[in-house]
């Protein structure tokens, strides 16, 4: 469903209101403890944030992609780590099931994912394989009516939190890119093992894990889509992911600007608020301009996608510009705070830690170029 501008603004306001009420007041504490109450995701589902592009018959909101990324910006402005769990659940996991899943898989998984009962995770990256996704080594070997999965995945968002995993594995070692398949399966399988929860610079409100598949047996019916089409399934929505990261970056940068602007109005030097000093005012103006430019880039790319047009180049541009912009803006926000910006008493310290990853995941800045 493609919506009009007024509808998009209404969706943005729903997401913003939720974020300001349910996330912002608690984000610093959740960052400190590296834990988020599971019921938060149930609450997100109640307002339609966990299955935004999924058809209503499966419990989703049936909205367009632009609605999704606008909501993503709002959640990311409150906390980047929580926004990333929302992203993984919506796309690629739920979207992939809707696009290529069997009727049984849709019945088994989609309503649980959209309701917040279950959370999904995507298992593609491996310890030595990031941007070169076709070089993965996790194996799936057929054994009667089952597949046996062995291997290790790395940097898995919500790897410990999630209830269902979309796993990309090699089913035909001689098949090249056509020898890779996708599986969708619950994580309560005894062969699914969390090796480590990573200690991260930022995004501490979600768990990022290394996952091992120890002779993990899954029924043949857990294959997602056709055999040999796994890499295509994983990468088919890559542009969606990159536009989503651009929206996350804009959200983080916007939070940094808001914090810097507020501080600049309160902090006084030489008898007046520092916002009245041209050096600071110019910084804030530049920050606001860069944020709006990044927003227009991701909004344009999302609009192309909603119209069924090719958007790979525009998605890469949006992610590249927005992710690097977010670090610059967060850095300037710290500078405006002076020494206080280096302390975790002020939000810009956390924001800076959170935005740094946007230049890395969903394809590094170098890959976008």
Model-derived segments and spans:
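Alpha-helical interface subdomain recognition
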Residues: 1-88, 100-105, 112-117, 132, ...
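Short Ser/Thr-interspersed hydrophobic loop/turn segments at strand-loop and sheet-helix junctions
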Residues: 48, 72-76, 169, 185-190, ...
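Short glycine/proline-enriched turns and hinge-like loops at secondary-structure junctions
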Residues: 63, 132-134, 158-163, 176-179, ...
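Flexible, glycine-rich active-site loops centered on histidine and acidic residues
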Residues: 94-100, 122, 134
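Short Gly/Pro-enriched turn/cap motifs at secondary-structure boundaries
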Residues: 113, 128-131, 155-158, 172-174, ...
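A short, Trp-centered hydrophobic/proline-enriched beta-strand micro-motif
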Residues: 116-124
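Flexible, small-/acidic-enriched active-site or ligand-binding loops
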Residues: 135, 188-219
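A short core secondary-structure module
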Residues: 146, 150-194
């Amino acid at each position: 469903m493609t919506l009009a501008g007024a509808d998009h603004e209404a969706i943005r306001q729903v997401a913003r209101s939720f974020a300001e009420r349910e996330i912002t007041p608690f984000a610093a504490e959740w960052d400190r403890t590296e834990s988020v109450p599971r019921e938060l995701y149930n609450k997100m589902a109640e307002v339609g944030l966990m299955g935004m592009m999924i058809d209503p018959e499966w419990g989703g909101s049936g909205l367009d992609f632009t609605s999704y990324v606008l909501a993503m910006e709002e959640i990311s402005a409150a906390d980047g780590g929580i926004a990333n769990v929302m992203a993984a659940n919506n796309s690629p996991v739920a979207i992939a099931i809707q696009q290529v899943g069997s009727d049984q898989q849709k019945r088994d998984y989609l309503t649980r994912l959209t309701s917040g009962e279950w959370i999904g995770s995507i298992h593609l990256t491996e310890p030595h394989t990031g941007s070169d996704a076709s070089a993965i080594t996790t194996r799936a070997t057929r054994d009667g009516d089952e597949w046996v999965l062995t291997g290790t995945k790395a940097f898995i968002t919500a790897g410990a939190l999630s209830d269902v995993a979309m796993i990309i594995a090699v089913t035909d070692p001689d098949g090249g890119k056509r020898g890779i398949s996708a599986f969708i399966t619950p994580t309560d399988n005894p062969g699914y093992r969390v090796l480590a929860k990573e200690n991260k610079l930022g995004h501490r409100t979600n768990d990022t894990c290394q996952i091992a598949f120890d002779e993990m047996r899954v029924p043949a019916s857990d294959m997602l889509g056709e055999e040999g089409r796994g890499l295509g399934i994983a990468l088919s929505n890559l542009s969606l992911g990159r536009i989503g990261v651009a929206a996350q970056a804009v959200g983080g940068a916007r939070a940094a600007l808001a914090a810097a602007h507020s501080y600049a109005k309160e902090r006084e030097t030489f008898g007046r608020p520092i916002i009245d000093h041209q050096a600071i005012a110019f910084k804030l103006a530049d920050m606001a301009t860069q944020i709006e430019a990044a927003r227009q880039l991701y909004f344009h790319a999302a609009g192309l996608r909603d119209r069924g047009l090719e958007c790979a180049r525009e998605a890469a541009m949006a992610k590249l510009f927005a992710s690097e912009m977010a670090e610059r803006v967060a850095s300037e926000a710290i500078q405006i705070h002076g020494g206080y910006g280096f302390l975790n008493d002020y939000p810009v310290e956390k924001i800076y830690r959170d935005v740094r990853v946007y230049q890395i995941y969903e394809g590094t800045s170098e890959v976008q170029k």
